[in-house]
Amino acid sequence: MARPLEEALDVIVSTFHKYSGNEGDKFKLNKTELKELLTRELPSFLGRRTDEAAFQKLMNNLDSNRDNEVDFQEYCVFLSCIAMMCNEFFEGCPDKEPRKK
């Protein structure tokens, strides 16, 4: 039986490959594929409307090697940044119950 972290890693990898290569390199997300992934898998991140300028800025920030696509490493950096932002948010929240030692 897979542990929760193993399952999370599987979801990260399988989600990338679900969208990558529909229109080209099967190991990269082009702009259309990335937008579809974010719209379907992270809808609260994009909000209800997609601001094209904001999306293009995100794409440019993720595309560290400037090939106009997002590879798996760039995708993981993006998810890591989101995870760190979530962690910082929850660090500021008071604990409801004291932590067990």
Swiss-Prot record:
Its main location: secreted. Ca(2+) 1 binds at K28, E33. Induction: By nerve growth factor. One of its GO terms (biological process) is positive regulation of canonical NF-kappaB signal transduction. Coiled coil: none annotated. SMART domains: EFh, S_100. Ca(2+) 2 binds at D63, N65, D67, E69, E74. It holds the Pfam family S_100. Keywords: Acetylation, Calcium, Cytoplasm, Metal-binding, Nucleus, Repeat, Secreted. GO terms for cellular component: cytosol; extracellular space; nucleoplasm; nucleus; perinuclear region of cytoplasm. GO terms for molecular function: actin binding; calcium ion binding; calcium-dependent protein binding; chemoattractant activity; identical protein binding; protein-containing complex binding; RAGE receptor binding; transition metal ion binding. The keyword Glycosyltransferase does not apply. Residues 12-47, 50-85 form the EF-hand domain. The keyword Mitochondrion does not apply. The modification N6-acetyllysine is found at K35. Transmembrane segments: none annotated. The modification N-acetylalanine is found at A2. It comes from the Eukaryota. It is found in: Secreted; Nucleus; Cytoplasm. PANTHER family: PROTEIN S100-A4, S100 CALCIUM-BINDING PROTEIN. Calcium-binding protein that plays a role in various cellular processes including motility, angiogenesis, cell differentiation, apoptosis, and autophagy. Increases cell motility and invasiveness by interacting with non-muscle myosin heavy chain (NMMHC) IIA/MYH9. Mechanistically, promotes filament depolymerization and increases the amount of soluble myosin-IIA, resulting in the formation of stable protrusions facilitating chemotaxis. Also modulates the pro-apoptotic function of TP53 by binding to its C-terminal transactivation domain within the nucleus and reducing its protein levels. Homodimer. Interacts with PPFIBP1 in a calcium-dependent mode. Interacts with PGLYRP1; this complex acts as a chemoattractant that promotes lymphocyte movement. Interacts with MYH9; this interaction increases cell motility. Interacts with Annexin 2/ANXA2. Interacts with TP53; this interaction promotes TP53 degradation. Interacts with CCR5 and CXCR3. Interacts with FCGR3A; this interaction inhibits PKC-dependent phosphorylation of FCGR3A. This is Protein S100-A4.
